[in-house]
Amino acid sequence: MTFPEIVKTTLWDIIDEMSHSLSSFVKNPDKDFIRKRKLDFKKMMHLIISMESGSLNHELLKFFEYDSSVPTGSAFYQQRSKLSVSAFRHLLKEFNLKFPLEKFRGKYYLIACDGSEFNIARNPDDPDTFHEPNGKSVSGFNMVHTISLYELCSKRYLDLEVQPGRLKNEFQAICSLKIGRAHV
């Protein structure tokens, strides 16, 4: 198996393990992902991780190999809303534990921290992320701000904090990123 295949298999194996203890990774453990659906927990995690920059309908069609009974965008949104943020934190943590980090000169971790802003789906009713129309945007836009910890030698993300665009506070985000949480 090539290294990329090992990485992908490892990722899918972690998601498979997670699917056996859903209560830690969903918002309502008593009812979320209990019934059999086309977009079960494993497929949702696989789909979200493998999505590219296409429209949601295109991504769903690709994921389900252009099957005529592909789930709708609405079904995707409903299932996605059941996932807890802890599912992705756990996946990142477990994945990083499977591949030890490289140390610079055998004893140091070189870690960078940087922020980025991302536009998200427009929703003028969300005051925490919506930015009013201005000279650059005629209809306004919604945005989130992320702060990431990145280990330079291993070329891996260790931790991430997401904040609503209008409430961004890089200093607070940096303080909430914990090297310990990243398992360095």
Protein language model features and the residues they cover:
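Conserved, well-structured functional cores that handle cations and Mg-NTP chemistry
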Residues: 1-181
